[in-house]
Amino acid sequence: IKGSPNLYAGGGGGGASNSGGAGQAGGGNGGVGSGVGGAATVNTGSGGGGGGGNWSAQFGAGGNGGSGVVIIRMLTSDYSGVTTGSPTVTTDGSYTVLEYTSSGSYTV
């Protein structure tokens, strides 16, 4: 979207009794034993890690999911420049990219 690899909306790692797997694309790591799953990377919309699955203890809680992100890409010639909030605005070749990580709007 922005000319360099960016990963969004990855799943969280699963919980297990011995070792939890790592989440992909910004997802949180899985919990180990009765441990808690790791939180996902912020502003990626990714899932949190799964809780631990220890058979002899309390199950650990799953990690928090990543906060959301909205990305709008358009030809720079179509970009009106009318925004609210605080989007990150970048130009990539002949495209303009708006990235919102909090409330805002874009008017065509």
Summary of predicted features, one role per range:
Residues 1-108:
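Low-complexity, glycine/proline-biased repetitive segments and flexible coils/loops
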